[in-house]
Regions:
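Preference for the N-terminal adenyl/adenosyl cofactor-binding alpha/beta module
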Residues: 1-272
Length: 272
């Protein structure tokens, strides 16, 4: 269903943008405050930082999920949903505690953004399902950690050092992907020279044509077996270079800084 694929692509992008936004504002901390010391998220509050923040969940990104319960549970998904709701709805100033799904919110203040980005009504498909811990952990790893490089292993990406245009490049990169449902079993292939580069472009080939490709062009999983996506699987692929040809592909930094400054000023000013 092409329409369902488009909707799921749109919702998946919104989900990723939520995470990117929170990575950025939490990492920037005090830099995101207005003249009253108010920010999008209260990173100075231990209660928020240790109990609700994305930064705390990020600390679990490399924890081995050794049991079936750990892999197939929904702790990370439920924690993110709670965080998204908190950012959207806020926690009123002057309230010391607020009941939340059988628990309580600690004493900190956060003003709801009421932004469409965090509105669950904009992501009805994702709202209707739960994501397993192993899936959410992989998403956090891909957004949090650099690629493995020699003896160094994977390092943590610092969102605090990202410039506005760099963050915009990530945004544009995500828009270069589109989603679709496999109409038949599809094999992943990649140019042999690019096989060690996980960011190189990947192609999907039906079983009937896989014989046209060499063994060193077949993408393999961790067990060394060819990667095959069953019929009905939802897949992301690069949508081509169309956006690079459009005016939306690049925005001068002076303009992005101006837009960011006054957008945040207007939003934070609503709290006063």
């Amino acid at each position: 269903d092409d329409e369902l694929a488009r909707k799921l692509t749109r919702e998946s992008l919104m989900y990723l943008y939520r995470l990117l936004f929170l990575f950025y504002v939490e990492a920037r901390g005090a830099e995101m405050e207005d003249e009253k010391g108010q920010s999008v998220v209260p990173m100075k509050s231990d209660a928020y930082r240790l109990g609700y923040s994305l930064e705390t969940l990020r600390d679990l990104e490399l924890v081995p999920l050794t049991s079936v319960q750990a892999r197939e549970g929904f702790f990370l998904d439920r924690s993110l949903r709670r965080l998204f709701t908190l950012v959207f709805e806020g926690h009123g100033y002057g309230q010391r505690e607020m009941s939340y799904e059988g628990g309580t919110m600690a004493d900190f203040a956060i003003s709801g953004l009421r932004s469409p980005l965090f509105d669950e009504g904009r992501t009805p498909i994702l709202k209707s399902v739960q994501l397993r811990n192993e899936v959410v952990q992989e998403v956090l790893q891909l957004l949090s950690l650099s690629k493995e490089g020699g003896r160094r292993g994977r390092g943590r990406i610092s969102y605090a050092t990202l410039g506005i245009n760099q963050l915009g490049a990530v945004y544009e990169g995500l828009l270069s992907y589109t989603g679709f449902f496999a109409q038949e079993d599809l094999h992943e292939i990649r140019a042999a020279k690019d096989m060690k580069d996980p960011e190189a472009r990947t192609y999907f080939v039906p079983t009937a044509k896989i014989g046209d490709y060499k063994e060193d062009e077949k993408v393999r999983d961790e067990r060394g077996k060819p990667t095959v996506h069953a019929k009905g699987t939802y897949l992301f692929r690069l949508a081509g270079r169309d956006r690079e040809k459009s005016a939306s592909y690049y925005t001068p930094e002076v303009l992005t800084r101006c837009l960011t400054k006054y957008t945040l000023k207007e939003r934070l000013g609503e709290r006063g």
